[in-house]
Curated annotation (Swiss-Prot):
Name of protein: AAA-ATPase At3g28510
SUPFAM superfamilies per record: P-loop containing nucleoside triphosphate hydrolases (SSF52540)
Cysteine pairs bridged by disulfides in the record: none
Lineage of the species this protein comes from: Eukaryota, Viridiplantae, Streptophyta, Embryophyta, Tracheophyta
Source organism (scientific name): Arabidopsis thaliana (Mouse-ear cress)
Regions that span the bilayer: 5-25
Residues annotated for ATP binding in this entry: 250-257
CDD domains named in the record: RecA-like_BCS1
Keyword hit for S-adenosyl-L-methionine: no
Biased composition (Basic and acidic residues): 326-339, 463-511
Family per record: Belongs to the AAA ATPase family. BCS1 subfamily.
Polar residues: compositionally biased ranges: 512-523
Length: 530
């Protein structure tokens, strides 16, 4: 009988030899021949194995979309993992102080359904592709594998998998936590890796009840949102993708971002904050939008500042006309375009949000915000693309009453009449009104805060008056300078004309003198000849 040391020695030699020949096989045997060998090896295993394997990958459609089946299976297996798996991953969930456990990578659990036992395997494959920037960047391709005896094939495919997907979807809805997403640079994401978007839990407290806006206007927006959320069959009947566009425009501080948060809380939707300046090109933009989920709001804030999307098509013709008559200077060089600069175009954005690609998934709201709606290209905000245009204006009396109730818990005050008059005369944003109403210490009560607002409104009115006077003064000075320049130009013109007249008279006199001298010379010549 061999000793333990000898056994380990033989084992080590065998493993070393196997690793050596495996390395030779991987390095020197052509890839197409290896594929041929592996194909027949798996076929041979299939002949002698009584088990069937079904693979569920994390991403489908060539890595463009996340698999809903994979997510449902993950939720289902998470409910089984606590009692069955040996290695677990722990995560927090909303409204719960306890942890939720799921299968760790390369773990397996056994499940039973109607007396039939099956096995689930959690797998991840890490590869090292060559990135565009010459660096080695890892990709993780995750998948679940279901293994069962082949005699149960019909029951597993027709009944068990339907049960798993249904249960997993229900668990996902129960544990769903709304999230706020932001897009990553394409250097950080790959087709099989969930790296296109980063997310954090979305816990913004804004609601329509706390939103400083006219109640009738708020009610109209809420009805529109409810109609949209229940309109799946209606949109299908009229032949439109199940999406809706909102344009929020108005001065800074008027509540555009708060409105987005209120919509998300009202509909229980996720929010995708799309930063266009980090998107490399139109193709990357499409991939980002395809990787968003249904029941979500896609937001592009301050779109008038995002790339060159503001009326560029109208300006193009004007610029071309101006350049027609200009000659290029010799040796003039065009500025180099930075390769890292975003190349997203207006047409690319329009096609992504409203073209054929927009119909790939439904129940989405697209929101644009801007401080200067007049700067935007009309094609970007036309009806049918941005269906609902909502002006977020300066604070008026109805909006003030909402703020007073939220911040001071009062619904009336002796100074309400004066505040209403001053709000009509003064442009003050809801954010500034809210900051003024907020108590700055425990000693400040509602009366102090209301009086402070009245004083602030008076100061703002005075500032506006002085600013208007300064603007009027500047305008008058500008007009005076313009008139002075016009007068100087007129005087210069008159002087030039007078100088030209004098030159003409002088030239005429000189010509007359020359003619007279020539005549005198002729007379003298005649006399000398005679």
């Amino acid at each position: 009988m061999l000793e333990t040391g000898a056994i380990w020695g033989i084992t080590g030699t065998t493993v070393t030899s196997f690793m050596f020949f495996w390395a030779i096989y991987k390095q020197y045997v052509p890839a197409h021949f290896r594929a041929y060998v592996e194909r027949y090896f798996h076929k041979m295993i299939g002949w002698i194995s009584y088990y069937v394997d079904i693979k569920f990958t994390e991403y489908t459609d060539e890595g463009l979309k996340r698999s809903q089946a994979y997510d449902s299976i993950r939720n289902y297996l998470a409910s089984k993992s606590t009692a069955l798996a040996k290695r677990l991953k722990a995560n927090e969930t909303k409204n719960s102080k306890s942890l939720v456990f799921s299968m760790d990578d390369h773990e397996e659990i056994e499940d039973e359904f109607e007396g039939v036992k099956v096995k689930w395997y959690s797998n991840v494959k890490v590869i090292q592709p060559q990135s565009n920037y010459g660096q080695r960047s890892s990709e993780e391709r995750r998948h679940f594998t279901l293994s069962f005896h082949r005699r149960h094939r019909g029951m597993i495919i027709e009944t068990y998998l339907d049960h798993v997907l249904r249960e997993g979807k229900a668990i996902g809805l129960m544990n769903r936590e709304r999230k706020l997403y932001t897009n990553n640079s394409s250097q950080e994401w790959y087709p099989w890796r969930s790296g296109k978007w980063s997310n954090v839990p979305f816990h913004h407290p804004a609601t329509f009840e706390t939103l400083a806006m006219d109640p009738e206007k708020k009610e109209g927006i809420k009805k529109d949102l409810i109609k949209f959320s229940k309109g799946k069959d209606y949109y299908k009947k009229v032949g439109k993708p199940w999406k809706r566009g909102y344009l929020l425009f108005g001065p800074p501080g008027t509540g555009k971002s708060t409105m987005i948060a209120a919509i998300a809380n009202f509909l229980d939707y996720d929010v995708y904050d799309l930063e266009l300046t980090t998107v490399k090109d139109n193709s990357e933009l499409k991939k980002l939008l395809l990787d968003t989920t249904s029941k979500s709001i896609i937001v592009i804030e301050d779109i008038d500042c995002s790339l060159d999307l503001t009326g560029q098509r109208k300006k193009k013709k004007e610029e071309d006309e101006e350049e027609d008559g200009e000659e290029k200077k010799e040796g003039e060089k065009k500025p180099k375009v930075d390769d890292k600069q975003s190349k997203v175009t207006l047409s690319g954005l329009l096609n992504s949000i409203d073209g054929l690609w927009s119909a790939c998934s439904g129940e989405k709201i697209i929101v644009f915000t801007t401080n200067f709606v007049d700067k935007l290209d009309p094609a970007l905000i036309r009806r049918g693309r941005m269906d609902n245009h909502i002006e977020m204006s300066y604070c008026k009396f109805e909006a003030f009453k909402v703020l007073a109730k939220n911040y001071l818990e009062i619904e009336t005050h002796d100074l309400y009449g004066e505040i209403e008059r001053k709000l009509e005369e003064t442009d003050m944003s809801p954010a500034d009104v809210a900051e003024t109403l907020m108590p700055k210490s425990d000693e400040e009560d509602a009366d102090i805060c209301i009086k402070r607002l009245v004083k602030t409104l008076e100061e703002e009115k005075e500032k506006a008056r002085k600013l208007a006077e300064e603007e009027e003064k500047k305008k008058a000075e500008k007009e005076a300078k313009k008139m002075k320049k016009a007068e100087e130009a007129e005087e210069k013109k008159k002087k030039t004309e007078e100088d030209e007249k004098k030159e003409k008279v002088k030239a005429k006199e000189e010509n007359g003198n020359v003619s007279q001298q020539n005549g005198n010379s002729i007379d003298l010549n005649k006399k000398s000849d005679s």
